[in-house]
From Swiss-Prot:
HAMAP family: ATP_synth_epsil_bac (MF_00530). Gene3D superfamilies: ATP synthase delta/epsilon subunit, C-terminal domain (1.20.5.440), F0F1 ATP synthase delta/epsilon subunit, N-terminal (2.60.15.10). CDD domains: F1-ATPase_delta. Its main location: membrane. It comes from Hydrogenovibrio crunogenus (strain DSM 25203 / XCL-2). Pfam families: ATP-synt_DE, ATP-synt_DE_N. Keywords: ATP synthesis, Cell inner membrane, Cell membrane, CF(1), Hydrogen ion transport, Ion transport, Membrane, Transport. It is a peripheral membrane protein. Belongs to the ATPase epsilon chain family. This is ATP synthase epsilon chain. PANTHER family: ATP SYNTHASE DELTA/EPSILON CHAIN (PTHR13822), ATP SYNTHASE EPSILON CHAIN, CHLOROPLASTIC (PTHR13822:SF10). GO terms for cellular component: plasma membrane; proton-transporting ATP synthase complex. One of its GO terms (molecular function) is proton-transporting ATP synthase activity, rotational mechanism. InterPro entries: ATP_F1_dsu/esu_C_sf, ATP_synth_F1_dsu/esu, ATP_synth_F1_dsu/esu_N, ATP_synth_F1_esu_C, ATPsynth_dsu/esu_N.
Length: 144
């Protein structure tokens, strides 16, 4: 029998995913991490980006704006501020959010305004990247 792990993705809105998986990929603060069953314990902050949950030939993709990844030997838990299934992301809205954040950065008058605009820009860019990666994966598998 194949070894798998329990994966739970939870946001303030509720549980988005709960199930068994063979591998999880997430955007940690220091770069992408790949988690396999029996991984050493880990607690790390997540930055805006894609989370992929792989089980056999199936792959579920999510966007999170920030959160925490906790890894136990047989359980991976992602606690996200906001989590959205990648297929539910709206590219036009993400592009508009990116444009607004860029405008806000140009018009920022304080360090706080700049920091807020940078966060908004990072989230919008991460959403666009998640959409692009999902589209590319679907195209490669002939599902687009």
């Amino acid at each position: 029998m194949a070894v798998s792990m329990q994966v739970d993705i939870v946001s303030a809105e509720g549980s988005l995913f709960s199930g068994k998986a063979d591998m999880v990929f997430a955007q940690a603060a220091d770069g992408e991490v790949g988690i396999l069953p029996k991984h050493t314990q880990l607690l790390t902050q997540l930055k805006p980006g894609q989370v992929r949950v792989v089980s056999g030939d199936e792959e579920d993709s999510f966007f999170i704006n920030s959160g925490v990844l906790e890894v136990q030997p047989s359980v991976v838990t992602i606690l996200a501020d906001t989590a959205i299934r990648a297929e539910d992301l709206d590219q036009a809205a993400a592009e508009e959010a990116k444009r607004r954040a860029e405008d806000a950065m140009e018009q920022a008058k304080s360090d706080t305004d700049i920091a807020r605009a940078q966060i908004e820009l990072a989230e919008a860019v991460a959403q666009i990247q998640t959409i692009t990666k999902l589209r590319d994966r679907l195209h490669k598998t002939g599902l687009s």
